[in-house]
Amino acid sequence: MMKHSLRHLALDGMNMYLKGPAGMISMYLHISPESVYERQPLESAKGKIIVADARIDNRVQLLEELQIPEETKAFIPDSELILAAYEQWGEECADRLIGDFVFAIWDTHQNRLFCARDHIGARPLYYYHLPGKVFAFASEIKGLLALDFVPQDLDELKIAAHLSRLSDFRSYVDGTYFQSIKSVKPAHFLTVSAEQFSQKFYWDLRLERFSHLKTDEDFIQEFRKTFIESVRCRTRTAFPIAAHLSGGLDSSSVSCVARDILQAEGKELHTFHMDVELPECDEKPYAEAVLAEGGFRHHYVKINDYDYYKTTTEVAYMTDAPSAFVVTPPAQAGWMKGVQKEGCRVLLTGHEGDIVVDYGMDVLWEPLKKGQWEVFEEKFEEFAQYAVNFNFSKRINAWSPQKIKTFYKGILLESELRDSIAERRWGNVKGILTRRGNWKSLFEAGKFRVEVAWPAITALGRLKANPNYTILGPGLQKYTLDHPEVSRQMKGAENNAGIPEHLLPHYQQIFSEGMTKFCDIFAHVGAHHGFKVAHPFLDRRLIELSLLLPTTLNFNEGKRRGTIREAMKGIMPESVRLRAVKVNFEPLIHQTLLTATPSFEEYYKSAAEQHPILRIWINEKEFLKRIEICKSNDYPEEFKSKLIWHLFRSIYLINFYSTYKENPYEKEVSRTETESSW
């Protein structure tokens, strides 16, 4: 039954509504002070019934606009507030909400359903629709798979995109790994009846409200205020709060601001740091610099305490999808279980902070496009002062700073290449680099390969994606960039918001497959451990402001991400605030390949014997060849790094498929009973 498959969501109970053609189930997890008054599904006097999973951040504003009596304001849960907003403003209510939410409202008089998902997709919502017959929705796919009228056929295009590592910056589509099950897209609402199905993008960014910001200092102060408010909204709970503290700029910013907010309330912030027990990937000194300032209850999680295959399989079951974590699932499993053990009901992250507050690389890209080579050289010189600290390949790391600068300038300032870049002839760019032998060097040399081209991600999609189709088995070979649907996705998100053209590349990075996919993963894994995962950088107010941050401010004379660095002055330790390097986790990935028991070869062969379709999806010869190369000392590290990710994607797929086949989902109602659901 659906309610059984989703029972992990009902930490504080559940309730049902069943009347006429409609049925709803609500699972309770108390977070905010007023959530203890939730009684869902909730029916209004006007015959509208709501179920919601929501944290509404602009409650004070809505309570005033809806003229809620003063004596009842403290007792109105978010679901009741959303229902009142819908009855007041109709479908426009979704864009009046700030926060993380999904909700569905059934109109008993018109036999019509209205569903909406928050602006960035922090909370997931899935549905199955058989027009004129049935519309079913759930917070997790497994809830829909528990219904026997929902087909369970897998989507091979989705599998091919996963295996080939198609760019996460492609446009987000509503398809899941199951052909018949769709996801409500972020910033969209659905209207459904027996005769109608429609979906609409609703986000009005209203960027003109920032027109009063003129100077860098104006933007820094506005960013600081908005960021602190974003964190504060996510700490509104009577339960313990946790934060992921890697020691990076983003997680440290969130942790330090949350610490200050909670200290003022006499509370401590639980922090969790993933100790990968590998010197090359050690961020502990940065985390310890934050912890030294006090106000934290810290927990170290050791990655080696968790089995690789077991945790990968657990993540597949929780998410109804192959894992997509960049760092291996044991690293994530550790702090998820730790948060659960401490009784925390909110986990704060710095997720995608470097996408929302970007690197300001337009400062390099614009003069490249315009052929302003003197300006480019000047700005590149600033960039290179810090680029020498990046985690490049071992070969390039051994070079002197001057040689690194000369190397990049030599490539980018070559006349033929300059003309091709200026004219956006990307195929020619690749050809030039290939002929000169610099293609691998440039695009394998750590951060730089992406960041110079970052603002042109749509045009450079084929280069940035770096998909590799040789890993695809015979049944998936058709799903390359020449496939119409793959090609469509690679164009990036449509400009539904109507924003100016020069802001579109940044908008497309935010409104992308990767952004929403990882929100889904965090939400599901958190739900299975009894807490909500909250991402302050994904607050709609912060995103709207960040689209307008001056490029020169973010570039910050080559230090990059200047807005967040300047806004965090006096809030976090200087050693972390000015940190120029992100850790490279590829040594951890290599170690996992070398030490996994059983070996990747044995694991694959055993799974393929049990599930022959894996040989149709995965090119076995290529898979085994890549393992041999990655374990060998005869190949350069940068070459092996290009291959190893597809091996992990293959293992993730194996565990997803095995979970799907070996854990049949419970069925709830017979097919014949649902044929006249409307």
Stretch-by-stretch model annotation:
Residues 1-321, 675-678:
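Cysteine-centered catalytic environments shared across enzyme families
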Residues 221-243, 337-342, 513-518, 654-659:
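Phosphate/ATP-binding catalytic cores across multiple sugar-kinase/actin-like superfamilies
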